[in-house]
Amino acid sequence: MKSIIIPADKESIYWNEVVKKEARGIDDADFGEVQMTMGDTVITEKGITDKKRFYLPKSLADKFDGHTLWFTITEDEAYNTYRDIEEIL
C-alpha cells in the first residue's frame, strides 16, 4: 500500500481523520496517539499508566501520511512547551 504524504502548508489535512492516529515529531519523537482536535490544537496522549498529554498547535503539523501525523518539533520542545500544565507542576 502506497502512503500519500499531505503537506500541512496546503491546508489539506483532514483533521477528523487524524483522531486515533499516531503523532510523531523530529527524529521520530513519539507524542502518542491523537485524541482529538480542538480549534487550532491537536491533543495527543502517550503512555498507558503514566499518561502524558500534549497540546500541539496545528501550525506545527508537517504532514499526515494516513497513519501518522508528523510535527516539526523535537521531543524536548514538546515536553517543555506543549505538555499539560498540571503535569508540569
Question: What annotation goes with each model-predicted range?
Answer:
Residues 1-89:
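Peripheral interaction segments used for macromolecular assembly
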